[in-house]
């Protein structure tokens, strides 16, 4: 059966034209991305399947959807004018789980069901596993998730709700390693570079071109993450022979506020580097104060209740706007991260956040440490490590837990009440402070 849309290796050009489940290029192990030579034809199908003629997974059944895609493309009335750009805002927070990832989860779930894969393992920083596991619930495929213990509380709870098994580990790198060790146990390991995920991501660029047209060059601003969104956007626009550039946004450092867009070594680094060398990609670093300011501007100038991660694309644009950009149509992607964290909202209201000052947004592990000590308990960090492992399934190293404790002390949320000698070792005894109790309440 000949398909209009084919998987093609970015590295060697090998094409997978028949229907089969593959993770990487069978020829060289490179990245596979869907290429479609056909016109953009929108059908009446729901979700990403409105563009089924341009999707590799289109011949698979049943097609899975939760109504993802077809998200609002809103012309900026004030921010674009203030920086001299023709600016549109693509609101991906309107997807079912609040992330553009839902587009890929629809095509991935369809493929997994079609190929009768019954279980998967997903290493994630939070959003990927929430989206994939949510869609797999519809087709009865079980999922196991590995996520860093530093993930925000809301993402930790969402993962616990939708995944069949969740394991908390020290870092995303450890999550990747543990997931890859499960390849013989689970039917598939879902990594960010999975071609069936990317198949669905492509519909973002397809929708943009369908709405805006092909007359003017495009600049698309996206969070860089692992690189899949930038690459999928580029290859859609390349297939359509459109002049374009991708502005990739990355956090300037790791912080609780922007941890979702802080990636030191993207999985697809070699492909991103090639795009940079060819002039299709420019990466911009955004810091906490810049993202917070952009979030405030989005609320007050455009009526967008979007958090710092979602507003980071606007922060990047404000940093690099130049005369040559005034001749193109610019689209900034707003994905997930609705403005709902009370500490971020408080900071915006009081305007107390200054450069290099952190907003206190705690991850799952730190919240659990505070909760453990919230009832007047005093204990050693070692005992905290044991309780986190036994009661909450946090499979962390002792060093990692001790580091969390030290950070909570530096934030004024824990304090050292005494030192005791146990088994020849001097151990500190810690307890929660009034500030820590207030934060929990």
Language model: regions and residue ranges:
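N-terminal juxtadomain amphipathic helix
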Residues: 1-65, 70
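Positively charged, low-complexity intrinsically disordered leader regions
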Residues: 50-113
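Active-site-proximal loop->helix
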Residues: 129-181, 342-347
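Active-site/ligand-binding loops adjacent to catalytic centers
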Residues: 170-183, 239-308, 345-357
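Active-site/ligand-binding-proximal alpha/beta "capping" segment
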Residues: 180-240, 275, 292-301
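Phosphate-binding loop/pocket of nucleotide- and phosphate-handling active sites
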Residues: 274, 315-363
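Short acidic, hydrophobic short linear motifs in intrinsically disordered regions
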Residues: 379-389
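A short, conserved structural fragment
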Residues: 409-419
């Amino acid at each position: 059966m000949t398909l209009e849309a084919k998987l093609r290796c970015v590295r060697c050009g090998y094409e997978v034209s028949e229907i089969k489940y593959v993770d990487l290029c069978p020829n060289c192990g490179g990245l596979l991305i869907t290429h479609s030579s056909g016109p953009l034809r929108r059908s009446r199908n729901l979700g990403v399947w409105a563009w089924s003629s341009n999707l590799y997974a289109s011949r698979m059944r049943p097609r899975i959807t939760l109504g993802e895609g077809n998200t609002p493309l809103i012309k900026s009335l004030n921010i674009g004018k203030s920086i001299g750009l023709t600016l549109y805002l693509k609101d991906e927070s309107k997807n079912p789980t609040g992330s553009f990832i839902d587009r890929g989860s629809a095509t991935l779930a369809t493929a997994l069901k079609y190929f009768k894969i019954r279980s998967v393992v997903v290493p994630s920083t939070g959003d990927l596993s929430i989206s994939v596991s949510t869609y797999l619930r519809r087709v009865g495929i079980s999922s196991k998730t590995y996520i860093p213990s530093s993930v925000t509380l809301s993402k930790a709870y969402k993962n616990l709700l939708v995944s069949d098994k969740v394991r908390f580990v020290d870092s995303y790198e450890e999550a990747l390693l543990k997931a890859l060790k499960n390849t013989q146990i689970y039917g598939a390991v879902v990594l960010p570079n999975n071609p069936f995920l990317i198949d669905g991501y492509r519909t973002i660029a397809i929708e943009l071109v369908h709405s805006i047209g092909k007359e003017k060059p495009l600049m698309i601003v996206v969070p860089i993450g692992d690189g899949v969104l930038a690459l999928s956007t580029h290859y859609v626009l390349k297939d359509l022979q459109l002049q374009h550039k991708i502005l990739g946004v990355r956090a300037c450092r790791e912080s609780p506020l922007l941890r979702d867009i802080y990636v030191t070594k993207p999985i697809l680094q070699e492909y991103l580097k090639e795009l940079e060398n060819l002039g299709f990609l420019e990466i911009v670093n955004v810091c906490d104060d810049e993202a917070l300011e952009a979030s405030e501007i989005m609320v007050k100038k455009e009526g967008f209740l979007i958090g710092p991660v979602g507003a980071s694309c606007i922060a990047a644009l404000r940093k690099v706007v130049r005369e040559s950009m005034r001749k193109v149509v610019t689209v900034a992607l707003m994905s997930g991260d609705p403005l709902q964290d009370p500490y971020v909202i408080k900071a915006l209201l009081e305007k107390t956040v200054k450069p290099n000052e952190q907003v206190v947004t705690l991850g799952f592990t730190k919240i659990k440490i505070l909760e453990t000590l919230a009832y007047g308990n005093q204990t050693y960090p070692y005992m905290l490590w044991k309780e986190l492992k036994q009661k909450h399934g946090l499979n962390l190293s002792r060093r990692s837990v001790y580091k969390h404790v030290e950070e909570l002390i530096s934030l004024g949320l824990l304090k050292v009440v005494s030192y005791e000698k146990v088994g020849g070792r001097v151990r500190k005894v810690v307890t929660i402070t009034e500030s820590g109790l207030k934060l929990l309440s």
